[in-house]
Amino acid sequence: MAGKPVLHYFDGRGRMEPIRWLLAAAGVEFEEKFLKTRDDLARLRSDGSLMFQQVPMVEIDGMKLVQTKAILNYIASKYNLYGKDMKERAIIDMYTEGVADLEIMILYYPHMPPEEKEASLAKIKEQTRNRYFPAFEKVLKSHGQDYLVGNRLSRADIALVELLYHVEELDPGVVDNFPLLKALRSRVSNLPTVKKFLQPGSQRKPFDDAKCVESAKKIFS
């Protein structure tokens, strides 16, 4: 029997958080090995674990996978969260890439210089309210189904619900303006695996605070 996946990253959200979400939603237990110093990262580089010299890296099924999208694609395929055919996969990819466009803005926000944060937050709020959330609300309205693609849970739903939580940390109450997105969040959040992940003490990471930002700088800068 294969061991648990092992996630190599620092103790923060970053590019590993969607991987944590997807594994948790799939009901997969995983271990984490946190980088704490530049030396920790250097050791992974020197032993050949990091193909492109960077993390996230996930040990799974005898592989050492890098590149966030590749890792997510593998997990989604392995645990039947990637649609039933090529067309559904294409739509799922389109939706998850849209989510990623906004998520990357949120990811960088805590790490920005103080003088740039106000403009960045304003852009996040504007893009959320006028571009991304209306687009996904329209999708759900167009087919009237419980999930984004094929009327069953996929990685697109999980990525979107993660995004809804992250946006509300910066723009509280914004999801209330989008009733179908709010219903999707409730639906996914009440799935037993996701509900467990949302509980205190899980491997879900909090918003990157100043301490987390400093820890990341010690490793990566």
Curated annotation (Swiss-Prot):
What InterPro entries does UniProt report for this protein, alphabetically? Glutathione-S-Trfase_C-like, Glutathione-S-Trfase_C_sf, Glutathione_S-Trfase_N, GST_alpha, GST_C, GST_superfamily, Thioredoxin-like_sf
> Residue positions of the PTM N-acetylalanine?
A2
Instruction: Give the superkingdom in one word.
Output: Eukaryota
Q: Which UniProt keywords apply?
A: Acetylation, Cytoplasm, Lipid metabolism, Transferase
- BP terms from Gene Ontology: aflatoxin catabolic process; glutathione metabolic process; lipid metabolic process; ureteric bud development
**What is the role of the protein in this entry?**
Conjugation of reduced glutathione to a wide number of exogenous and endogenous hydrophobic electrophiles. Catalyzes isomerization reactions that contribute to the biosynthesis of steroid hormones. Efficiently catalyze obligatory double-bond isomerizations of delta(5)-androstene-3,17-dione and delta(5)-pregnene-3,20-dione, precursors to testosterone and progesterone, respectively. Has a high catalytic activity for aflatoxin B1-8,9 epoxide.
- Oligomeric and partner information: Homodimer.
- Protein name, please? Glutathione S-transferase A3
Q: Which organism is it from?
A: Mus musculus (Mouse)
The organism's lineage?
Eukaryota, Metazoa, Chordata, Craniata, Vertebrata
